[in-house]
């Protein structure tokens, strides 16, 4: 009797357990079917938890806004575009993503599953960026080279200018030294002449008259005298000899002419009268005829030499 009761209780418990299991399974079936149907319409990337490209673009824009500096107070922020319609397709979002590609910061993490076209576009932009950097580098290198060449050229010009300056300075110093020596020699000569002149002028009147008579007789005897030799003979300066001859010509003591070779040619009064008589007799006389006749009318032989020839 007790065994039958125990079997009946066990059977009842088993039926209750099976019933509860079936009820639980029946309630869980309607929730599973809509979830399965929803997954059939969702792309695989969404099911795998990969964000959509529009979401990637929005995330990139958000990062750009966070990294971008705040706009100045006077600058007006660009107006936002009209809100997108709820029914816009993914193609519109993809176009917006393409427009924002230029603002993608360097080194931004990109989706590994982006399309081949977008990847090619990004690679082209990267290539252009590298090309621009290379051009800038080449330009900087060229500027550095040109600056170096300009500095070398300027240094060479400075060296040449310094050499030229030293050469001119050396020539100037040499000229000054030469002029200084000439001036010193001139002063020494002037001092010597001054001493000789003072000694001559401090003599008594008789000695001066004697020297003047000797001076006049020397010129008359030699007929043609070199002024420098005459100055040495009487211990005078050349200019003093010239001045004294001109004074003697002015008072009629001496007659003659000083040529351009530094010589004085003495012509006596008789010889001048003979030349004047010849010109008066001929009327018109050419220079050649006058020179030829003067050689015959004017005797330029020194008296001492003429006396020796006559005695011999």
Swiss-Prot record:
Its membrane topology: Single-pass membrane protein
Localization per Swiss-Prot or TrEMBL: Endoplasmic reticulum membrane
Record-level Gene Ontology MF annotations: ubiquitin-like protein ligase binding
Example of a GO biological process term: protein ufmylation
Highest taxon listed in the record's lineage: Eukaryota
Cellular component annotations (GO), alphabetically ordered: endoplasmic reticulum membrane
Keywords from the UniProt entry: Endoplasmic reticulum, Membrane, Transmembrane, Transmembrane helix, Ubl conjugation pathway
Annotated protein name in UniProt: DDRGK domain-containing protein 1
Organism whose genome encodes this protein: Drosophila yakuba
């Amino acid at each position: 009797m007790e065994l039958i009761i125990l079997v009946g209780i066990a059977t009842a418990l088993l039926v209750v357990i099976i019933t509860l299991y079936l009820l639980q399974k029946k309630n869980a079936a309607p929730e599973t079917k809509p979830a399965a149907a929803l997954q059939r319409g969702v792309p695989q990337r969404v099911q795998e938890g990969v964000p959509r490209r529009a979401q990637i673009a929005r995330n990139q824009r958000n990062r750009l806004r966070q990294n971008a500096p705040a706009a100045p107070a006077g600058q007006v922020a660009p107006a936002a575009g009209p809100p997108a319609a709820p029914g816009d397709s993914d193609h519109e979002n993809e176009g917006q993503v393409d427009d924002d590609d230029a603002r993608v910061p360097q080194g931004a993490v990109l989706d590994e599953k982006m399309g081949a076209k977008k990847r090619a576009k990004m690679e082209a932009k990267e290539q252009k960026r590298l090309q621009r950097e290379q051009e800038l580098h080449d330009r900087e290198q060229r500027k550095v080279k040109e600056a170096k060449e300009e500095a070398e050229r300027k240094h060479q010009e400075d060296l040449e200018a310094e050499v030229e300056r030293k050469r001119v300075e050396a020539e100037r110093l040499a000229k000054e030294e030469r002029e200084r020596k000439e001036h010193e020699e001139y002063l020494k000569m002037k001092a010597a002449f001054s001493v000789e002149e003072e000694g001559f002028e401090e003599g008594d009147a008789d000695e001066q008259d004697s020297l003047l008579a000797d001076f006049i007789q020397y010129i008359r005897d030699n007929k043609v005298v070199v002024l420098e030799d005459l100055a040495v003979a009487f211990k005078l300066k050349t200019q003093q000899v010239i001045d004294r001859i001109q004074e003697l010509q002015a008072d009629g003591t001496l007659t003659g002419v000083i040529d351009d070779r530094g010589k004085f040619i003495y012509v006596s009064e008789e010889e001048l009268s003979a030349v004047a008589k010849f010109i008066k007799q001929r009327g018109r006389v050419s220079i050649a005829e006058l020179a030829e006749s003067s050689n015959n009318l004017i005797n330029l032989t020194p008296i001492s030499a003429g006396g020796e020839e006559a005695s011999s």
